[in-house]
């Protein structure tokens, strides 16, 4: 196993995001997987970014499970008038999936394996002290398949009243991916809110009037005249953040908690 230093989050109490430099290796370190991962929560939407996904000495396909839950009604994919039957489905060019009030929306049309079926198991398989009685239930399990690596990708999980609304949200998302690579993962929302995870010194264009630059790794949430920052490396060091022409030097808490600062943005 491998534990990297970079992990943290930022919140203003109602919205926020988490990010981490993720790595997983086998017991001898011969095989493993790594990626930069980012989850932004804003209203009824969670935007998920994965950058620089890499695998070493793996002989099985690499995939991301978008969800795994009890099946709670009909499932629609790309067409709001056509329900998907039970079974194992290998789906190409997926733009959206709708189930039980939720829309699953990949940033680009994607290949997804979707399980709609009954499965069985027992709690004792994950905890020896639990009961051995077999349990059975129907599940929904959408799995995003990845092709050649390294790769970067994104998807969103959003509340939607109907399959028709899921289709509309896929066509006109309420979020914009500003950057998704090994240096920075960032998204913005219609009110100008920006959430950005910097893994190194860098700069992003966050709309026509906002430019954000940092001199070292940090997590930033910018909403109107408030800046929220944290230190994902938990070092307690100072960071210089430049918003347009205004530079701020901030000493961040070493425990990774959010630091709040009033800022003045161009109108």
Spans of model-derived segments:
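Short Pro-Gly-centered flexible turn/kink motifs
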Residues: 106, 148-159, 261
